[in-house]
Amino acid sequence: MSMPHIPASRGGVRIEHLVTSGTFSLDGGTWEVDNNVWLLATDTECLVIDVAHDAVAILDAVGDRRLVGVLCTHGHNDHINAVDAVRAATGAAAYLHPDDRMLWDVVTDRAPDADLAGGDRLTFGDVDLHVMHTPGHAPGACCFHAPALGVLFSGDTLFQGGPGATGRSFSDFPTIIASITSALFDLPDETVVLTGHGGATTIGAERPHLQDWLDRGH
């Protein structure tokens, strides 16, 4: 399947991307993982979605631009473990849904700077980000929809090939399916899904496979 087109920019706002590597730990297990770090950026400012593993690489990507905030799709360590170093270097605020505080608190003693809630609307330049609370992979999991760019930053809620994992603590398969069907599948087919791990997909590419996911149970 060909990769979906990622819009280059709108009103000077563009999407930038890097992959960082590290480990994910939960329930006594540890796994090596590669994570996507997404930036909404202009020439002078940027907003980071998920601060995974490598603060140096993330700060290099930010460069001399002002980091206006860090949005955390959820509280698993592999998505937030560079948060303190990035905050210390930039003074940027970190946003997290409060239902994931028990996961966050395993990683850092410093609280998030602000709460996310479903229905929130955040603005970066000419781009609005709609916060969608999509529990299932984690209780506080959130996706960020940028209608003007035609993209959804899905974290670990939706991937190419199905929903995020639900076999560990604080996760639930029926809940993630409800989040996807009641929120994400209402988006246009052409919406590009930029995921927390791996390649991009579209809503239209994933919607027809819902019954397959239900049949396999994950």
What are these regions (language model features)?
Residues L39-L40, L96, T123-F124, F144-A146, ...:
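Conserved hydrophobic "DFG−1" position in protein kinase catalytic cores
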Residues V70-I80, M132-A141, L194-A200:
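Histidine-centered catalytic micro-motifs
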Residues E32-V33, C46, V51-D128, P208-R216:
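Active-site HxH/HxHxD metal-binding segment of metal-dependent hydrolases
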Residues G28-T30, D113, H133-P135:
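Short Gly/Pro-enriched turn/cap motifs at secondary-structure boundaries
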